[in-house]
Amino acid sequence: MLQKIMAINAGSSSLKFQLFSMPDEQVITKGMIERIGKQDAFFSIQYGEQKHRETFAVENHQQAVDHLLSALLDHEIIKSLDEIAGVGHRVAHGGEAFSDSACIDAAALQQIEHLGTLAPLHNPVNAIGIRAFMEALPHAKAVAVFDTSFHQTMPPETFLYALPYRYYQEQGIRRYGFHGTSHKYVSQICAEKMETPLSDLRLISCHLGNGSSLCAIQHGRSVNTSMGFTPLAGVMMGTRCGDIDPSIMPYLAKQENKTADELNALINNESGLLGISGVSNDYRDVEQAAKEGNERAQLALKMFAERIRSFIGSYIAHMGGLDALIFTGGIGENSRTARAAICHALEYLGIALDETKNNANETFIQQDSGPVKIAVINTNEELMIARDVMRV
């Protein structure tokens, strides 16, 4: 029997949604509400061939949810709220408490809020969105889908930092990893397209966007990932520096009299492609500047690709080989030059890009003789959320 399942991604001032027919995985409607808390909040919704946009005042997430549900009725997308059988919520951090998506009850919601200490910008807002939908749709199944849970299969020798062990025991300091929903989804799709059981494959998923992370996936399980305790760690990103020598922070604090908050802003908001190029955090803008001869933009692109190649080599060693390299995310899916730069000089590892296939945006872009598949797969975190609502 078909069911209507809603996937929700609540941000500090936004609410993105998709309503699916499941299990046939058809999108019924999608849209978002932006500028929550403002007098000129913006609502957009798309269904069939119709698009509707409006501006109105929204004080909080509860009002945003109420407006969204009213719009579904007003536009006759549904006849009754009872038609919505379940709601899946993207939640940033599940810590060690959640190794999989979970049905939300009072105890689970309290745990999500408690984990706000690890994700203060995200978990509290995620919890607000959950409460708003649970109040508006008390009959509907509520499921939390965590960015971190896919990586809970990493072994301790991989997820622990070489700090005194008590900091892990008392403060939960360890590698958690993020983008798990995306990495999980594209690994499943890649296995389907390769017509090979996921349990037989060694994959590296490269989710590349303004935030970027890599994930080593062996037998369908995450065994390593580039992001760490926070989404700052790993490769160079739009405004985040990725891995650096930690001693740089106390050095800058002393030399430039910077506070902890100022240093945090520096490495999260002022670094990466933006910091090196001086042009933009948007890969497309940096790419254009590089074409026009901007040497710092050219350097930023080289650094971006080099950091990713280093992780690819490390993960191949970790898994003892590689069956497929996956590109996803805004950059991974859309920038043929980024894919080419990353794969450059990796032929000795079996990663041989076919330039014609890459430029044609085909799904598999490796040379015919290449032993490692190179796949370009559009991520769909909302669909993965809807699938998990049906599964758990």
From Swiss-Prot:
Pathway annotation from the record: Polyol metabolism; 1,2-propanediol degradation
Functional note: Works with phosphate acetyltransferase (pta) to capture exogenous propionate and regenerate propionyl-CoA during degradation of 1,2-propanediol (1,2-PD).
Organism: Tolumonas auensis (strain DSM 9187 / NBRC 110442 / TA 4)
Location relative to the cell: Cytoplasm
Gene name per UniProt: pduW
Enzyme superclass (EC): transferase
GO molecular function, one term: ATP binding
A single BP term in Gene Ontology: acetate metabolic process
Identification of the protein by name: Propionate kinase
Domain of life: Bacteria
